[in-house]
Each structure stands twice: as structure tokens, then as C-alpha cells.
From Swiss-Prot:
Highest taxon in the source lineage: Eukaryota
UniProt KW Acetylation keyword: no
Protein name, as recorded: Cancer-associated gene 1 protein homolog
Keyword entries, A-Z: Coiled coil
Coiled-coil regions listed in the entry: 377-567
Gene (UniProt): Cage1
Annotated segments matching region Disordered: 118-161
PANTHER family xrefs: CANCER-ASSOCIATED GENE 1 PROTEIN
Length: 847
């Protein structure tokens, strides 16, 4: 197919692309020669305007009011994508009206119907064009001005164009070397062959007109062959009548007649269309060919109505008037028509194919009817698709709203995520700080545990030492208890003996007092008697002296009287015995006084040291009780904490010193006991002396022989006892002081242990609180991580939803774009509608 033929197919398609015939033709040819059509369109924009003018004028020539005014109504009406109910079936009525009009016509009528069926869907397609295409169409006034300018320009170009260029263009136009075998070029070739078969004997003017038409078709971009064929058919009817009128004319008249017809037809066409339109060209060509056609061939065209003959006669008269003006043009075109004779001979070979082409035309008519049915189905499908597109637009609007809402939600979620991230960073910082604190606390706890383990070891050691000390103290306490019991028993025995002795001494004192009083009275009486006796003794001495003198005298006389009398010797012995009796009570009284004084001093010495001993034994018992209480406290405080090593060393030293002092005290007590035993012997001797005092009263001579050393020892014994008792009390005081020190140390240790226990409890509580805080922060961080994961999942879900909604918005557009090629390739299939319905259901479900 040549470039002009591709433009003939594709040119109307730019304006009327919804007809099924044009759709099939366009998609079959545009895929092959898309680049060529673009180049031709760029170079020949002016020819498009002339082709549009031709379309507007040819509609008025047909005489169809509805079809002729249809493009104007489409241009005036706004573009609407929806198809109304009354307008859906408008092409049906038009086409059936055309079929009714063409039922009685011959083979050229079929070509005319075919050309009409090609043109009218192109006109119908303007309903479905976009508003931009409708807005780009020029106004009728502008079109007329452009038509006039284009006619003048085309005339000048055709007059001054060289013959060589016209020949090449005509040959290229009619040979059709590059024509592909598609449906639309096949129909066009059939129509051209029919027209050529009716125009076999061509005249000189016909050749020139054909050449001129070839030049115009080759120069223009959109050669509307369908309109040309229809114009040829219209031009054939008046030419028959003109041929019948001028059969008797001369050759000069025949040569001039076609020229006049051509000029008259040209003038007639100037009133309606441009002079260089394809309809005018083919009219002139048809009129010139009919003058040279034989009578056998004109019988097929003699059936035209008489009304058209009258119109043609009027047109012929007008053409005769204008024929003189066109003689000069005919002379110029004479050379060009010579080149067309060779082409006419080639075209005569195609006449044999007419009967084949008639069958093809019938088949094409059937195919056209099927295509019309398919077109109606496509229109219905398109209406459904438009409805579904509206639904999809509504769904897309809803999806846009949902997208906006989701974007708002996403923005809010992003803000929340940012806040959560800030909180998460803060929590991480807190967590890091708390982990550091936890590590510090853990290190502190480890150090504390180490110190506690060391202290536990030290406590165990101290407990061991404590056990040893307790054993030692228990043994010492047992010994002390035993000694205490022994001492208490001894003390009780001493107290009993002392009480007995005191009682005895009191009795004795009373007796002695009574005796002393008696003795004092006796002494006083004796002193009185002594004085009296001294006086008597003096007297007696005097008497004794006298008596001695007398005795001497008597001895002298006795000697003299020995023999005489024995009585005077017995009287001398009696006064001697009286004197001895008087001397003895004086001596006994002196000895008794000295002995009483000694025993009184001893008793006083005994009473005086024993009273403070009683007073001192009471604090000893109290201190022993305090020691027992402290030992009980030590036993109760075994589980308490242990002091430091220095305190333990000091306590060990103090315990050692105390043990040594206790041992020294025990030794001293033993020494004192021994000394007491010795003094007991002396006391026993003193008791024996006291017991013997009674016996000594009767034996004064024996008392005079009493040892002076023993008396000195007896007088020194209470002093020694007091000294030893003082030493014993001092030792007891030292023991009490050491016991108080031990109690103070134990109390200090108890306080220290209690403090350590409290500190350990505090540390344990602090560690427990830290562990609880760490666990709580870990839980908080876990919750924050979970919230972040949830927010990330929500964001991902929203992103997926947005993508899905964007895909849903894109899908109707893509399917609307791909809908036309699918409908063109498969016009009868309804699978796309079902697919769209299913997709619409999916969209509604997803929304």
C-alpha cells in the first residue's frame, strides 16, 4: 500500500475511530506503517483542512438531511461519554434507511452503499470522541474561508506543475506496488475496479481529469477514496443523460461538450465544495468518459430518474457557458492525458475480474452487516463498561478518600512512632544508666558478698574460738560454780559456826559480863577489903612483928615447952592457910582480867573483819549473777555478726589476761584457804584456850606458867586475818572489774554485730529493690519493643494497603486504555465485561 492509501485509511480514523470497519482497517495498517503516516501528517497539514471541507460538503450532496447535518450537530453538541437510549439506535435507523434506498440499485449502488457504510460510522464516532477533539474542529465560516484559499492555491499549482511530476505521481497512485493485502484496501480496490469498468472508453478530457485527480491525491495526506467513489457514482447519472442528448452531435461538439460539462460541474461544485475536491474531479472524469462510452454499456445506467436528467441539462447549459474559459486549461492538460492512456490500458485488464469482485462485494456486504451487529454489541458493551467505569471512578474516589484517611493515619502513626522512638531512646538511656547502676550495684554486691564471705569465714573462726572460749568459760564457770558452791557451803558453815560462836560468845560475854560485874564488885569489895586488909595487914604485920617477937619468945618458950604442950603448933598452921586463901583470889582476879581483855579484843577483831566480809560477799554474788547473765547473752548471740580482727585480737588478749588473772585469783584463793586453815587451827587453839580459861580460873598457878609467845601470836592473829581478807577482797574487786570489762566487750560486740546485721539487711533490701527496678525496666523495654513491632507492622500493613489501593486506581485506567484494542481484535467477545465485573466485585470486597 502506498502512503496516500495508508492516509486514506488512517485519515478518517483520526476523527471517526469508533466504527468497526475503520477500527479493523486502522489497527491492521497503522501497526505496519505508523512511522510513514507520521511523516506524511507533518508535511501536509493544509490538506487535512481541505479533506474536512470535502466531508462537510459531500454530506449535503447526498440529500440526506439527517446524515448531512450529522457532523454539524456533532460539532455543535458537547462531547459526552455516556450514550443515551434514543441515540444508541440512531445508526441502525440510518443504515437500514440506506439499505432501503439501495435495494433497487445496481452494482454501482453497492459501491455507493459501501462508501456510505464506510463514511457514516466515521461520522458516528464523533459522538464518542473526547472534548479536546471537538474543541479542535474549526467553525463553518472558517472552513469556507480555508476552502476558498485552498481552491485558489490548488488551481495555481495544477496549472504550473510540470508534466513529468504529474506522470510519476499518477503512475505511483494507480499502480499500488506497496499495497498490503488487508480488508480495507481490498474493498477500495474493488470499488475502484467497478468505477473503472464503467469508464473503459475514456476521452481526452477524462484522461486529463484523472491525471489531475492523481496529482491531487498524491499531494494530499488524506485521500478519502470512499467519498471519491460516491462522487463518481453521482457524477455518472447526469453524464448518461448528457450522452443521450448529444449522441447526434459532431466530434467538435463532443470535444467541446465534455469540456463544458467539466466546467459546469466545477462551477456547480464551487457552490457547495472546493473546486479541487475529489467529487468534482470524478464528476468531470465521469462526464468525459460517458461521451466516449458505447451504447451497450450505457443501458445499465439509462434507468436513472428523469428528474436528475433535467438537473443535468441545466448543469450542461451552465457548463457550455463556462467551457470557453476552460479551453486554455484543456490544452495544458492534453499532454498529461497522454500519459494516462497507458494506465487506462493496464486498467482494462482488470475488467475481467469484475464478476469475482461482485462476489467479494456480496461477501463484504455480509461482513459489513456482521460488523454492524458487532458494532451494536460493542456499543452495548461500551455502555456497560462506561457504567462500570463510573462505578470504578466512584470506587476510586472512595479509595482516594480512604487513601487520604490512611495517609492521615499513617502521619499520625509516624508521629506516634517518632514519639515512641524518642521514648524508646530515653528508655534506652535510662536502661543503659540503670544497667550501669546495676553493674555497679552488682559489683558492690559482689564485693559485699566477698566481704560477707570473708566475714562468714571470720565468723566461723570466731565461732570456733567462741566455742573454745565458751568451753573454757563453761569449764571455768563450772569450776567457779563448784568453788562458789564450796565457798558458799563453807561460808554457810562459817556463818553457822560464826553464829554459833557469836551466840556462845554472847552467852559467854553475858556470863563474863555478869562475872566481870561480879568480879568488879568483888574486886571493889576486895579492894575495899584489901585496903581494909592492908590496914589489917599492917596491923597484922605489926601484930606479926609482935607475934614474931612473941613467936620468938614463944619458940623460945616452946622449946621450953615442947615437951609440955602440942596445941600451940596447930594454931600457927591455921593462920597460914587463911593467908594463902586471901592471896589466891587476888591472883586469879588479875589473870582473869587479862584473859578477859584478850578475848574481848579477839572477839572484837573477829567481829570487825567478818562484818565487812559479809558486806563484800553480797556484791560478789551480784557480780557472779551478772557474769551468768552475760554468759547467757553470749550463748544467745552466737548467730550474730562478728567484729573485726582487731577487736577479736583484743578480745583474745583480754580473755587470756582474764584467764591468767582467774588462775592467779584461784591460786591466791587456795593460798588464802590454806592460811585460813592455819588460822583456823589457831582459832581452834584460841577456842581451846577460851575453854581452858574456866579451868585456869581454878588453876592460877598454871596460868602463870602460860607461854608469852602464844599470847603474842594470839594477839597478832586478827591483824593477819584482816590483812589477808583485804587481799582477798582486792582480788575479788579485780575479778569484778575484769568481769565488767568482759561484759562491756560482749555488749560492744553485740552492738557491732547488730549493726552489721542491720547493714546486711539494708544492703539486701537495696539489692532486692535494684533487682526489682531492673526487672521492671526490662519489662518496660520489652513492652516498648512490642509496641514498636506493632507500629512497624501497622505501618507495613498501611503501606501494603496504600499500594493495593494505588494498584486498584491504576488498574481501571490501564484496562480502559487496553479496552479498545481488545474490543477491536475481539468485537463479539464479552469476556472483558465479565472480567471487569469480577474485578469490580473484588474491588468492592477489598474496600
Amino acid at each position: 500500500m502506498s502512503e496516500t492509501e495508508t492516509m486514506n485509511v488512517n485519515g478518517p480514523q483520526d476523527f471517526y475511530s469508533d466504527s468497526p470497519f475503520c477500527l479493523e482497517a486502522s489497527f491492521s495498517s497503522s501497526d505496519l506503517l505508523q512511522n510513514e503516516t507520521k511523516n506524511v501528517k507533518r508535511g501536509n497539514e493544509s490538506v487535512h483542512m481541505s479533506s474536512e471541507d470535502i466531508l462537510s460538503t459531500e454530506g449535503s450532496l447526498l440529500g440526506d438531511i439527517n446524515l448531512g447535518n450529522y457532523p454539524e450537530r456533532i460539532q455543535n453538541q458537547p462531547a459526552n461519554t455516556r450514550v443515551s437510549s434514543s441515540r444508541q439506535f440512531e445508526p441502525i435507523c440510518k443504515f437500514h434507511w440506506i439499505d432501503a434506498f439501495n435495494d433497487d440499485s445496481s452494482v454501482p449502488d453497492l459501491t455507493r452503499a459501501f462508501s456510505y457504510s464506510e463514511e457514516k460510522p466515521e461520522l458516528q464516532s464523533q459522538v464518542y470522541n473526547d472534548p479536546a477533539d471537538a474543541s479542535q474542529k474549526p467553525d463553518p465560516l472558517k472552513e469556507e474561508s480555508l476552502m476558498e484559499s485552498s481552491t485558489s492555491e490548488n488551481k495555481d499549482e495544477l496549472v504550473h506543475e510540470p508534466v513529468r511530476k504529474s506522470r510519476s505521481l499518477c503512475l505511483n497512485h494507480y499502480r499500488g506496488k506497496t499495497r498490503p493485502l488487508t480488508e480495507t484496501p481490498l474493498v477500495r480496490s474493488v470499488v475502484v475496479d467497478v468505477a473503472l469498468n464503467n469508464n473503459q472508453p475514456e476521452s481526452f478530457l477524462g484522461k486529463e481529469n484523472v491525471c489531475r485527480n492523481g496529482e491531487n491525491l498524491s499531494d494530499s495526506e488524506n485521500c478519502f477514496d470512499q467519498l471519491d467513489l460516491r462522487a463518481i457514482y453521482k457524477a455518472g447519472k447526469p453524464e448518461v443523460s448528457s450522452k443521450g442528448i448529444q449522441n447526434s452531435g459532431e466530434f467538435s461538439d463532443m470535444s467541446v461538450g465534455p469540456q463544458e460539462e467539466v466546467t459546469e460541474d466545477g462551477l456547480d461544485s464551487l457552490a457547495i465544495t472546493s473546486p479541487w475536491s475529489p467529487a468534482g474531479i470524478f464528476k468531470g472524469r465521469r462526464s468525459q468518459d460517458d461521451f466516449q462510452m458505447p451504447d451497450g454499456e450505457l443501458d445499465f445506467e439509462s434507468l436513472e430518474p428523469l428528474e436528475e436528467d433535467m438537473a443535468l441539462n441545466e448543469a450542461l447549459q451552465k457548463l457550455k457557458q463556462t467551457n470557453k474559459k476552460q479551453e486554455l486549461q484543456i490544452q495544458d492538460l492534453h499532454g498529461r492525458n497522454l500519459t494516462l492512456e497507458s494506465r487506462v490500458q493496464e486498467l482494462q485488464t482488470k475488467v475481467s475480474k469484475q464478476h469475482v469482485l461482485l462476489d467479494i462485494i456480496n461477501k463484504l456486504k455480509v461482513n459489513v452487516e456482521e460488523l454492524i451487529d458487532d458494532k451494536y454489541n460493542v456499543i452495548l458493551e461500551k455502555n456497560d463498561i462506561n457504567k462500570k467505569l463510573q462505578d470504578l471512578q466512584e470506587t476510586s474516589a472512595n479509595t482516594k478518600k480512604h487513601l487520604q484517611e490512611s495517609k492521615k493515619d499513617q502521619e499520625s502513626l509516624q508521629l506516634q512512632v517518632k514519639k515512641i522512638k524518642v521514648h524508646y531512646v530515653r528508655l534506652q538511656e535510662r536502661y543503659i544508666a540503670e544497667i550501669q547502676q546495676k553493674n555497679r550495684s552488682v559489683t558492690q554486691c559482689l564485693e559485699i558478698e566477698k566481704t560477707l564471705s570473708k566475714k562468714d569465714e571470720e565468723l566461723q573462726r570466731l565461732q570456733r574460738h567462741k566455742g573454745e572460749l565458751e568451753k573454757a568459760t563453761s569449764s571455768a564457770l563450772d569450776l567457779l560454780k563448784r568453788e562458789k558452791e564450796i565457798r558458799e557451803q563453807e561460808f554457810l558453815s562459817f556463818q553457822e559456826e560464826f553464829q554459833r560462836r557469836e551466840k556462845e560468845n554472847l552467852k559467854e560475854r553475858r556470863k563474863l559480863k555478869s562475872r566481870v560485874e561480879k568480879l568488879v564488885a568483888q574486886v571493889k569489895s576486895l579492894l575495899f577489903t584489901c585496903e581494909s586488909e592492908r590496914a589489917q595487914t599492917t596491923a597484922l604485920q605489926q601484930q606479926v612483928d609482935a607475934l614474931r617477937l612473941e613467936n620468938l619468945e614463944l619458940r623460945q618458950q616452946a622449946a621450953k615447952r615442947e615437951a609440955q604442950a602440942c596445941t600451940p603448933s596447930f594454931e600457927i598452921i591455921q593462920p597460914k592457910e587463911k593467908l594463902e586463901e586471901v592471896v589466891e583470889p587476888d591472883v586469879t582476879q588479875d589473870t582473869k582480867g587479862t584473859h578477859c581483855n584478850l578475848f574481848l579484843n579477839c572477839s572484837s577483831c573477829k567481829e570487825n573483819p567478818e562484818l565487812p566480809s559479809m558486806k563484800r560477799t553480797s556484791p560478789l554474788t551480784s557480780r557472779l549473777h551478772s557474769l551468768l547473765a552475760l554468759t547467757i547473752g553470749l550463748l544467745t548471740c552466737q548467730d550474730l555478726a562478728i567484729p573485726d580482727t582487731e577487736l577479736r585480737q583484743e578480745s583474745k588478749k583480754a580473755n587470756d589476761i582474764m584467764l591468767q588473772r582467774l588462775k592467779d585469783c584461784q591460786l591466791r584463793k587456795k593460798d588464802l584457804d590454806k592460811e585460813l586453815l592455819k588460822h583456823r587451827n589457831r582459832i581452834a587453839t584460841l577456842k581451846e584456850l577460851i575453854a581452858n580459861e574456866k579451868a585456869l580460873q581454878d588453876h592460877t598457878m598454871e596460868i602463870t606458867d602460860f607461854d608469852t609467845e602464844e599470847v603474842k601470836n594470839a594477839s597478832e592473829a586478827p591483824v593477819l586475818l584482816t590483812v589477808k581478807l583485804d587481799k582477798y577482797h582486792s582480788l575479788n574487786e579485780e575479778l569484778d572489774f575484769l568481769i565488767t570489762k568482759l561484759g562491756d566487750l560482749l555488749e560492744s560486740k553485740e552492738d557491732h554485730y547488730s549493726r552489721l546485721i542491720e547493714e546486711n539487711d539494708k544492703y539486701r533490701r537495696h539489692v532486692g529493690s535494684l533487682i526489682n527496678k531492673v526487672t521492671s525496666y526490662e519489662e518496660i523495654i520489652k513492652c516498648a519493643d512490642q509496641r514498636l513491632e506493632i507500629s512497624h507492622s501497622q505501618i507495613a500493613h498501611l503501606e501494603e494497603r496504600n499500594r493495593h489501593l494505588e494498584d486498584l486506581i491504576r488498574m481501571p485506567r490501564e484496562k480502559a486504555r487496553g479496552l479498545r484494542p481488545r474490543l477491536d481484535n475481539h468485537p463479539k467477545s464479552m469476556t472483558l465485561i465479565s472480567h471487569l465485573e469480577g474485578h469490580h466485585k473484588e474491588c468492592s470486597i477489598s474496600m
